[in-house]
């Protein structure tokens, strides 16, 4: 059976990464969190000690930037940077980089090139609408915002991250949704041919099962 190209968009903290990493393992597909590509490039820019406000210097670094993903590990120019991509330094700098059209175009083309051999699941905010509009399967994952905030808060407590209250997380998600859905370049949208999944009252494994079954069904029709 021929494998598929699967595009996934969805709201922040709706479980996209944890769910579709599991789906990818079961199906023996390659999982790509496209947001990590932007984080990896941001790390690369910071590692070169350039002026992060100088767009020309940032754009020039694209010529020497090499990104690879293997077994959930992220490599930049053969350096494993997986554990360096969640630093506050990167999170503070990334918005100055993602707004640059040339960076955006580079990433979209790289992501499109990546899936030419099929057997890929790409997750992001505008994958179904911009990056892979012709994907074999498009999915929009959503969840009630209060439930998203509750899950994130409980996850933080479990990991002993106590810097934000439930209310703060809830307010952050409201702002994040607004930013994602109204950004000028690549806003989060529900495209007409996407399969809408609301996982507010489903477990991770329940969503994984229905997606895997759907993929098997589509593969058998190829």
Swiss-Prot record:
Enzyme Commission (EC) number: 2.7.4.25
An annotated GO cellular component: cytoplasm
Alphabetical list of SUPFAM superfamilies matching this protein: P-loop containing nucleoside triphosphate hydrolases
GO MF annotation terms: ATP binding; CMP kinase activity; dCMP kinase activity
Pfam families recorded: Cytidylate_kin
Gene3D superfamilies, alphabetized: P-loop containing nucleotide triphosphate hydrolases
Name under which the protein is recorded: Cytidylate kinase
Chain's gene name: cmk
């Amino acid at each position: 059976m021929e494998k598929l190209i699967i595009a996934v968009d969805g709201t922040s903290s709706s479980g996209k990464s944890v769910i579709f990493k599991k789906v990818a393992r079961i199906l023996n597909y390659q999982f790509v969190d496209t947001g990590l590509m932007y984080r990896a490039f941001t790390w690369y820019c910071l590692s070169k000690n350039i002026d992060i406000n100088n767009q020309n210097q940032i754009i020039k670094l694209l010529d020497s930037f090499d990104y690879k993903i293997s077994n959930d590990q992220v490599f930049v120019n053969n350096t494993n940077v997986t554990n360096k991509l969640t630093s506050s330094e990167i999170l503070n700098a990334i918005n100055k980089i993602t707004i640059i059209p040339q960076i955006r175009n580079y990433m979209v083309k790289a992501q499109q090139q990546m899936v030419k051999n099929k057997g890929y699941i790409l997750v992001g905010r505008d994958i179904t609408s911009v990056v892979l509009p012709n994907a074999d399967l498009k999915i929009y994952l959503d969840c009630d915002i209060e439930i998203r905030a509750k899950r994130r808060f409980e996850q933080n407590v479990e990991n002993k991250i106590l810097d934000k209250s439930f209310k703060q997380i809830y307010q952050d998600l409201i702002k994040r949704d607004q930013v994602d859905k109204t950004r000028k370049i690549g806003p989060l949208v529900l495209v007409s041919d996407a399969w809408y999944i609301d996982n507010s009252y489903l477990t991770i494994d329940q969503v994984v099962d229905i997606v895997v079954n759907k993929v098997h069904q589509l593969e058998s029709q190829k």
